[in-house]
Structures are given as structure tokens and as C-alpha cells.
């Protein structure tokens, strides 16, 4: 019997197709983003809307509460803005701040929308009860050492120890995966789905990337004209779902 919760049209859209895709280093992606950011393009909000839509589809299939692991950088900002969009459709959205520093605007948006901030200890105690985890701890920022540390590492170790883990959606790359070469520490949370923004990151198809990334969704942020100036780090055959972000409500109103 067909599952009444599943939309056949959406299911067809979300089915990955195998294609050869150019993958880029983190530096190349940042360079491609720079002109758009200089123009004032809201790339983070656009990425977060796409992330929230994909997370909402996951929750429709497997209903339950969502745990957002938010780091200090733009990756955490993406996750927190997505939490704001997701708060109206998920059963509950809990946010764990794994660093003292946080993207304040994104956190304020998430809390205003109904997400609640919980402690690492509370999240760890009830982690098996979540249906979905958004991994927004580390992204593609420049780091000399990408190993998870402190509360982030402890929480990931707790998740790894579960016999039945929640589904995991990685924000841009699984936290701790090197975005260029795909190397990773032993303590890393494998994703069921990775939502990557603007361009495929080389680390998703190199090293441990394929085993840790799950199904890859590639969100179009309009970087293609600028990526032509860069040489791909690698071109790989990969199962990928291409995503076009929905317009913000203000954008639609202006066009109308």
C-alpha cells in the first residue's frame, strides 16, 4: 500500500540522477561567492531556505522532533536560519550551541520562530528521541585542524554509540570532513543526506567523502558564471539531486 504521507511528484524530484559533476576546493567556492556577497546577495538565507525545505521533506517522511547542532561560523548560521524556517512544520526544533560564539541574527530568528535552545547535556540525554539531526557544526571555513572538540565531539560520540540513530542531514559537508581531500577523523557523524551549496565540494567525492555524505543535494546559488574562472579540483560521477531554492516571500511580493 502506498504511504499517504509521500508525494509521488516530490519523490520523483528527489530521486538522484547519476552524472559527471565538477567539484571545487573550498577556496574556489569562496572566491565564487565573493562577488555575489559584495552585491548584497543573501546567500546564507537562500541556502537556509533550501536546507529547511529538504529537512521538512525528511520530517514529513519520518515525523518527530529535530535537533540542530549549530557551530560558530556560517555553517551554524545556515543551520539556525533553516531552524527558523523549519519551526512551523516540525513537531519541535531544539538547538544546541556547541560554541560560545554564534551567528546572533540567525539564532534570534530561530528562537523568534519557536525553536528552543537546549543544553548539550539535555540534548545528549534525549538524543535517541529525535527524528532528524541537522549537522551544522563545521563547514568549509579555513581550519588547521578539522577534528571535532569539546561538547561537539562528546555529542557526536553519543550519537555514534546509538544502536538506532536519528536521520542525519549535513549542512554543506559532514562536520569534520575536509572539504578538499575528503579526509576525516574517526569521530564524525555520517550523513544520510548532505545539502551542499553553490558547488559540489571536492571532499564529498574524494577520500571518505562518498561513505560519509549519503545522498547529496546540490543547491544552485548562482555561482556558475564565477566558477568558470576556477579549475575544478576533480570531476566525478556522482548521484546528485539538483535543487533550485524557492524565492523568499519578499522577493515574490516584489515581482508581483
Swiss-Prot record:
Region ranges (Disordered): 1-21
Family: Belongs to the NnrE/AIBP family.
GO molecular function: metal ion binding; NAD(P)HX epimerase activity; nucleotide binding
Residue span(s) of domain YjeF N-terminal: 23-229
Coiled-coil portions: none
Annotated residues for binding of (6S)-NADPHX: 74-78, 139-147, 172
Reaction equations catalysed: (6R)-NADHX = (6S)-NADHX; (6R)-NADPHX = (6S)-NADPHX
Pfam families for this protein: YjeF_N (PF03853)
Biased composition (Basic and acidic residues): 1-18
Protein's recorded name: NAD(P)H-hydrate epimerase
Cofactor(s) this protein requires: K(+)
Enzyme Commission code(s) on record: 5.1.99.6
Residues that bind K(+): 75, 135, 175
Cofactor, free-text remark: Binds 1 potassium ion per subunit.
Top-level division of the source organism's lineage: Bacteria
Purpose: Catalyzes the epimerization of the S- and R-forms of NAD(P)HX, a damaged form of NAD(P)H that is a result of enzymatic or heat-dependent hydration. This is a prerequisite for the S-specific NAD(P)H-hydrate dehydratase to allow the repair of both epimers of NAD(P)HX.
Alphabetical keyword list: Isomerase, Metal-binding, NAD, NADP, Nucleotide-binding, Potassium
